[in-house]
C-alpha cells in the first residue's frame, strides 16, 4: 500500500473548489480524478507546488519555478484545457456531472 501524500486533503479541497469556480466537472471515471489529485498532492509534498502529474519533465524543480504547469496550469486558466482530465468542460465526452468526489471514493481508488 502506498503512503498517502500529506497534501492529499488540501488538494482534494482545492480540486472541488476550482471545479466549481471554473464551472468544470470531474471525469466520469472517478479513478482518473483520484489519481490526478494524488499526483498533484505528491508533487506538492515533494516540490512545494502542485505540478501537473500528467506530463514528463526533464527537471521538475525548474518546471515548478516556471509555474506554467502548476495547477491550475496556464492552458486551464486561459482556455479551460486540462491535459490530466481533472477539470472537464460539460461538453467533453468524458465529463461526469459532479464537481465533488467523496473522501471515501478518493481513498477507494487510491488503495
From Swiss-Prot:
Residues that span the membrane, as ranges: none
Reactions performed catalytically: [thioredoxin]-disulfide + 2 reduced [2Fe-2S]-[ferredoxin] + 2 H(+) = [thioredoxin]-dithiol + 2 oxidized [2Fe-2S]-[ferredoxin]
InterPro entries, alphabetized: FTR_bsu (IPR004209), FTR_bsu_Cyanobacter (IPR024707), FTR_bsu_sf (IPR036644)
Pfam families tied to this protein: FeThRed_B
Cofactor: [4Fe-4S] cluster
Residues annotated to bind [4Fe-4S] cluster: 52, 71, 73, 82
Cystines in this chain: 54-84
Entry keywords, A to Z: 4Fe-4S, Chloroplast, Disulfide bond, Iron, Iron-sulfur, Metal-binding, Oxidoreductase, Plastid, Redox-active center
Location in the cell: Plastid, Chloroplast
Cellular-component GO terms for this entry: chloroplast
Record-annotated active site: 54 (nucleophile)
EC number, UniProt record: 1.8.7.2
Organism superkingdom: Eukaryota
Chain positions of site Increases the nucleophilicity of the active site Cys: 83
Listed GO MF terms: 4 iron, 4 sulfur cluster binding; electron transfer activity; metal ion binding; oxidoreductase activity, acting on iron-sulfur proteins as donors
Co-factor remark: Binds 1 [4Fe-4S] cluster.
Subunit: Heterodimer of subunit A (variable subunit) and subunit B (catalytic subunit). Heterodimeric FTR forms a complex with ferredoxin and thioredoxin.
Role noted for this protein: Catalytic subunit of the ferredoxin-thioredoxin reductase (FTR), which catalyzes the two-electron reduction of thioredoxins by the electrons provided by reduced ferredoxin.
Family as reported in the entry's similarity comment: Belongs to the ferredoxin thioredoxin reductase beta subunit family.
Protein name listed in UniProt: Ferredoxin-thioredoxin reductase, catalytic chain
Gene: ftrB
Amino acid at each position: 500500500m502506498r503512503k498517502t501524500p500529506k497534501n492529499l486533503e488540501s488538494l482534494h479541497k482545492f480540486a472541488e473548489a476550482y471545479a466549481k469556480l471554473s464551472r468544470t466537472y470531474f471525469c466520469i471515471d472517478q479513478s482518473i480524478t483520484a489519481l490526478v489529485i494524488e499526483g498533484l498532492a505528491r508533487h506538492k509534498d515533494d516540490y512545494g507546488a502542485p505540478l501537473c502529474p500528467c506530463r514528463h519533465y526533464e527537471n521538475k524543480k525548474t518546471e515548478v519555478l516556471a509555474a506554467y504547469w502548476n495547477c491550475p496550469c496556464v492552458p486551464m486558466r486561459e482556455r479551460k484545457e486540462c491535459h490530466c482530465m481533472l477539470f472537464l468542460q460539460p461538453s467533453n465526452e468524458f465529463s461526469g456531472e459532479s464537481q465533488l468526489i467523496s473522501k471515501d471514493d478518493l481513498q477507494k481508488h487510491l488503495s
